[in-house]
Each structure stands twice: as structure tokens, then as C-alpha cells.
Amino acid sequence: MNNQKYIRNFSIIAHIDHGKSTLADRLIEYCGGLQAREMSQQVLDSMDIEKERGITIKAQTVRLVYKAKDGNTYYLNLMDTPGHVDFAYEVSRSLAACEGSLLVVDSTQGVEAQTLANVYQAIENDHEIVPVLNKIDLPASEPDQVKQQIEDIIGIDASEAVLISAKSGIGIDLVLEAIVNKLPPPKESSTDILKALLVDSWYDPYLGVVILVRVIDGSLRKNMKVKMMATNSVYTIENVGYFTPKKHISDVLHAGEIGFFTASIKQVADCKVGDTITDEKKPCKQALPGFKPNLPVVFCGLYPTDSSEFEHLKDSLAKLRLNDASFEYEMESSSALGVGFRCGFLGLLHLEIIQERLSREFDLDLITTAPSVVYKIHMREGEVLEIHNPADLPDLQKIDSMEEPWIKATIMVPDEFLGAVLSLCTEKRGIQLDHNYIANRAKVVYKLPLNEIVYDFYDRLKSCSKGYASFEWQMDTYEPSELVKLGILVNSEVVDALSTIVHRSRAEQRGRALCVRLKDLIPRQQIDIAIQASIGSRIIARETIKALRKDVLSKCYGGDITRKRKLLEKQKAGKKRMRQYGNIEIPQSAFIAALKIGDE
């Protein structure tokens, strides 16, 4: 198959739950990619978490063969991309592998914030976009209003939008005809020298790393030696093929085609998404544009609740890293929690998914420390440090200034909840950049500190809008900020696991909230326990757990007063010794609850 005019490479853009994976299932079914008995819901979402949460995490591809009404047979390469903001870079690379997109919008809900972000990326990649309105068989469907929304918000013509119901299969043939007639074929190859885009990769226990590629120029053949331009690694191709969505082995992938190859590569970390693959003997002169390394944005500590599970956790993280190169970890120890790992994630959803996979696939019970972000610390000597662990923060006297990351957030919300959303953004130190109305929905754009987002922003946004607000963000800039390290002391001992870096204006509120929470969680002892929040050497909040009174005189029935006095003196001396050397045991449940504090 080398006639490029019969190839269509396209992706499906949609907000979570707007029916993207269901539409992909119907297209596969219609084109006979799988037998009816092999079909399952969300065929392309392979992980259980993907199916349960209704999200796509890894990019998947499928080649469909479609005989169109014009009598020609077309080869359609569907690229199923992640829709969540944490995986925005993967989305941009998947879109770069295609020439067109289907924009799927739920006709009962309208355009959402995440749809916007991905549509703008598709427009940047010069995609031809075909609007598709899903769920038209539902009573609440408003296709005309949603068409108007698409034109007003995104600015593309929606008058000929395809009306479908992916669940019941209405209009699937119209979608396939629109793909053939409205989306362009790949550009003609200008050279025979191999140039291919690495779209995604995952680990297969039998084949090693499987690499998903889009061939731009030349062709990719079995036994060919190829070079990765970002890492300069050279590999010999062992298998070449494509998915239907079953794996099919072929001898060659031509320009314009999307498929996979294997080359006994051991680690996914060696295969960077967005890299350019070329022939080792005749390399192309220039790499494809847009490659950038995927850097973690959110960090937190993961500790096993039982220290004997440490080796199991270490092995489990290594296995997850095989399949997820954007996830990073290094060992760290805490006096309160023992030995664990400091892990880096692309965002909060990524963190949640890794946590869930560790507990589900590896049966681990973990404590997660408060999430933090990367701060830039300008030292007085001129050195610039990047830190994400509060324990690494240098002495305040040596610091000249600190910078924290800010993000640009787009929020779409029904106008009746707008007031609550605006006050939440203001409370989180947000700066409003834009605000406009489309029909009965408002679109607001805010600049917000990432530090404030990683705690509980998303949960609070959903609760103050009854679940109707949608939220999308991208990194913006680093800006100078008055940051301080908030320490927690129990009985004058610093508890390192509860230390956080916060903005000075929020320090007292968060410190007080933590002290109050810990007061309820730490069991009473025979002495008073002071729980304090501090900035440097200054105490900003304090709570005291009152002592239990142990009645040492209960066994003295009558008798001489000196006997009673002797027992009381002995107890007094014991308490003094306890205050001096006493070690307060903080139960694990207290840590877990205290770390969930958010901004209460």
C-alpha cells in the first residue's frame, strides 16, 4: 500500500466522557477491524484504570480498511490520544502524526475547557477539523445551540457538523465519508531518506519496547539499522507492523503510514516521545520540529506503611518506569516515615494514576506526602537552585530571592456558578486575564500559582460548581514570590514529613489548620504535648494536647501522708524525665489524615 492519496491519518479530539473511545469502537466495528465477539467497550483503552475512569492515558493506533461510496478502498489510521491536560505533550505529538481531526462534542453539554486546549493544538498543527456532535439521541441534546457554540468559541464552521450517536451506532457511515472527503491525505514524500516521528512507546515482556511511529519520508523496513536523533542510539529493526487493533506484522512501512516496530530495546526511557528516527547509514539532515523532554511538574514522597515492603515498592516503581518514561523517582529517607521515594509526575492526574496502579497492580499500601512543585532559589552568591523537597531548602539568610511556577488556566462554567468560581480563584492568589460569555456559559482565564493548584483546587472547583466546571491549564512563567518553609514541631522535635513550602500570606492559616488537625489525631500521653507551626525560629501557631492524669494513689487506702507524697514525687520525677527524653509516637493514621489537609 503505497498510494498516499488513499491514506487518511486522523485523531479524535474530545473532552472526558464526550464519547471518544465509544466512537473509536464503532468505527472499528463498522470497518470490520474486530469480529463482533471480540469487541469490548473501549477497545483501545487497555488499562483497567483507563476503562474505569473513562480516560485514555497511552496513545493507541488502529488501521481501518474502508470501502467508500466512490468505490475506492481507503486506509484510515485512527490515533486515539489522551485527552487530559497532564498528557498534553503526548497529545501534541500524536496530533503531529496526523493531517486531520474529528472534534467530538457532546450535544447535551457543549464545548468544554479541555476540548479547547486540544483543538488549539490541532489548529497549530494545520489540521483540517470535522466537527462531530455525539449523543443526538438523548432528549437533552441541543445540536443547533452546540453548533453555534463551536463557531463562537473555536471559530470553525460547524454548519455541516456530523450528527451521530456513538453508543447506538447512528451516523457512523457519515463520519467515515467525512473522513474520506474532508480530511487531506498525507503530503507526498519529498525524499527517500527515512524520517519518522516517534509517537509513543510501551514495554512488552516478549518483544521489549514497542515503538509507535509515523513515517514522514522514506520507508521503514525489517533488519534496517535506525538511529534515534535525540539520544543518538542505534538499533536494528526486528519486526515492523501495524494494529487493526490486533497486531499485524508486515515487511515495510511506507511514507504516510502509521505503525510500529520492535528492536529489542530494553527501556522506554531510551525512546523519547517526539524524537526523530532516521536511517543510520543515510541519516536525514534535520530532525522534526517540536521535540522537548518531558519534565515532571508535581513531586511528592511515596512511603510504604510497612517498612518491610520497601524492596517490593522499589521493584514496583522500576516496573512502572518501564512503561512510563515521564515518571521519575529517587530514594529519600524521613525520620518520621522511614525510607521511601521522592517521585516526579506530569500533574495531579498522573500522580493519582501511578498511586492507583501501585495499590492495584502491586498490592502496595502507601503513605503519600503533600505534593509540591519545583521552586527556583536565587542564592546570595549568585547560584540558582531548583528544589522540590522542603527538606532541601537552604538557610533563609543565604537566599536572595525565590521564584515559584505560575500557570495559565482556562475554566468553562455555567454562569450561575461563576461567582463561586471567581472567589475560589481569588482566594488562590489568582490574577484574572480574560472573561467572556458564550450562551449560558462563562469562559474565564486566570493566572494562578501552581503551588495552590496541587492541593485541592480541582476538588473545590468541582464542588463549588456542582461538577459542571471544566478546567485546563498549561505552564506559564516563574515569578518572584514570598515563600517560606512551614515546619511542624511535636514536643519541640521537627517532623520533616509534614514540612511544606507555602506563600507567606497563607503560612499562618495552613500552620494553624495542621496543628488543630494533629491535636485531634495524636493520642494523649502522661505529659502535655505541644504541637507548633514555625517559620524558621518563629512559632506562628500552637496547640497543646493536655496530659492524661494517671492516679498513682489509687492503691493507697488511707495510710501515712508521707507514703502518698513519696509516690507523687516519684511520678513528678518520671514526668520530668519523660519531658526531657520522651519520644512522642505519631501514629501513621495521623500522618495520612494530616497530609490530606488541603486548605481547610
Curated annotation (Swiss-Prot):
Any Pfam family the entry gives: GTP_EFTU_D2
Presence of the UniProt keyword Protein transport in the record: no
Enzyme class, UniProt record, top EC level: hydrolase
Keyword terms, alphabetized: Cell inner membrane, Cell membrane, GTP-binding, Hydrolase, Membrane, Nucleotide-binding, Protein biosynthesis
Positions of the tr-type G domain: 5-187
Catalytic activity: GTP + H2O = GDP + phosphate + H(+)
GO biological process terms on file: positive regulation of translation
GO molecular function terms attached to this record: GTP binding; GTPase activity; guanosine tetraphosphate binding; ribosome binding; translation elongation factor activity
Compartments, record wording: Cell inner membrane
Entry membrane topology: Peripheral membrane protein
Matching InterPro entries: EF-4, EFG_III/V, EFG_V-like, EFTu-like_2, G_TR_CS, LepA_C_sf, LepA_CTD, LepA_IV
EC number: 3.6.5.n1
Keyword flag tRNA processing: no
GO cellular component, one term: plasma membrane
Binding site for GTP: 17-22, 134-137
The family this protein is said to belong to: Belongs to the TRAFAC class translation factor GTPase superfamily. Classic translation factor GTPase family. LepA subfamily.
Role: Required for accurate and efficient protein synthesis under certain stress conditions. May act as a fidelity factor of the translation reaction, by catalyzing a one-codon backward translocation of tRNAs on improperly translocated ribosomes. Back-translocation proceeds from a post-translocation (POST) complex to a pre-translocation (PRE) complex, thus giving elongation factor G a second chance to translocate the tRNAs correctly. Binds to ribosomes in a GTP-dependent manner.
Name under which the protein is recorded: Elongation factor 4
Species this protein is from: Rickettsia bellii (strain OSU 85-389)
